[in-house]
Amino acid sequence: MIFTTSKNSSFKAEFKELLERGKMDIAHVSATVGTIIDEIKSNKNQALKEHITKFDKWTPVSDEDLKISTESMSRAYENLDKALKAALHLSYDRIKAYHEKQKPRSWFDDEPNGTILGQRVTPVDSAGLYIPGGKAAYPSSLLMNVIPAQVAGVQNIVVCTPTPENEPNELLLAACHLCGVSEVYKVGGASAIAAMAYGTETIPKVDVITGPGNIFVATAKKMVFGDVNIDMIAGPSEIGILADDSANPSHMAVDMLSQAEHDEMASSILITPSQKLADAIKAEIENWLKILPRQKIARESIEKRGAIIVTSDMQEAIDLMNEIAPEHLEVATLSPFELLPLIKHAGAIFLGHNTPEAVGDYMAGPNHTLPTGGTAKFFSPLGVENFMKKTSIISFSAKAINEIGEECALIAKIEGLTAHEQSIRVRLVK
């Protein structure tokens, strides 16, 4: 773990290295992913079955084997522990309520001369949602992807999730039933992205693909973008924390480890103007590591991609964090809302000592599918707008076209587009 201060002579180099760590290099998998996509485009279901045999260690006999039955999803839901079922329902309700507030509205504006201008917002026809499966299956990811698509009004929702050894994750199936999803396919990785982007005999082509995944999934999404829309190209999970002396060192340590336990590539960075707090957090990290079930993963992550940085003041800490533009940003300070206007770049901001990042993963309401690797400088969280499109509406009356027609025709003439010019002039009153 990098443990440093901004006053160190080597800090600029250390910080630059820290920023580079967060970037995802897809060059080494691009050729493999490109081949997978080409095989799906050419051989469709047959290629899917071959890829499932190779990567998930089971062989679909028929095309029907690719799809998970609604009966198995219903059964998984009924078998859920009562408390867990209630928790999933509460999560669903909170996520839906938040995303309902996001929904963009169509608008129209009438001008006195009879011109009508507007913007119509409508859902895409179909969406493909990729949900990681196997041991890393997260029902929360299903809720976070399905709900905004449903709120947007998408009629056809397809879910793809890998099922190693043909054993679907029961929690994931239960969440599918809770959300009312019926088209769920046992396909993962780049193969799933290609299948949803181009269609097979079983899996329909969709308009937009969303959802998290490993480097092969991220690379496939990047490659199919343009043939379909995508939400973002997300890399390993990351957390940034701004903290002052009012923060609890033990809380800060476990918050950092909440990302580190995801995988070895996850990033956890805390920046504070307090050397005392930094020292205490470093000690608490070791205490927490001793008791975590995923200690090995968390330790490797925190050692290779963790950092605690001490700055001269909070403004410098904020400036550094804006440069990082983390996926998740906790502001664990005495007056977090006073700092909020100074924070420019983050996927989601968690304000105050009682707002751990984990509450945003499951229950707060905002989406947990967030931009990573510094892309929060230009990408936004997954939301309802990812499943909607805007169409411009234009209507001119005879009076309106005559009021601006000459000026419009003049610009067309200057651009050398005679048919454009004449299509306006023929409508003008001489």
UniProtKB/Swiss-Prot annotation:
GO MF annotation terms: histidinol dehydrogenase activity; NAD binding; zinc ion binding
This protein's UniProt keywords: Amino-acid biosynthesis, Histidine biosynthesis, Metal-binding, NAD, Oxidoreductase, Zinc
Gene3D superfamilies: 1.20.5.1300, Nitrogenase molybdenum iron protein domain (3.40.50.1980)
Pfam families (alphabetical): Histidinol_dh (PF00815)
PROSITE patterns for this protein: HISOL_DEHYDROGENASE
EC nos: 1.1.1.23
Residues that hold substrate according to the record: S237, Q259, H262, H328, D361, E415, H420
Reactions that this protein is recorded to catalyse: L-histidinol + 2 NAD(+) + H2O = L-histidine + 2 NADH + 3 H(+)
GO cellular component entries: cytosol
Cofactor: Zn(2+)
Active-site residue numbers: E327 (proton acceptor), H328 (proton acceptor)
Primary role: Catalyzes the sequential NAD-dependent oxidations of L-histidinol to L-histidinaldehyde and then to L-histidine.
Family recorded in the similarity comment: Belongs to the histidinol dehydrogenase family.
Cross-referenced NCBIfam families: hisD
Record-given protein name: Histidinol dehydrogenase
Organism whose genome encodes this protein: Sulfurimonas denitrificans (strain ATCC 33889 / DSM 1251) (Thiomicrospira denitrificans (strain ATCC 33889 / DSM 1251))
Lineage, broadest ranks: Bacteria, Pseudomonadati, Campylobacterota, Epsilonproteobacteria, Campylobacterales
Gene name tied to this protein: hisD
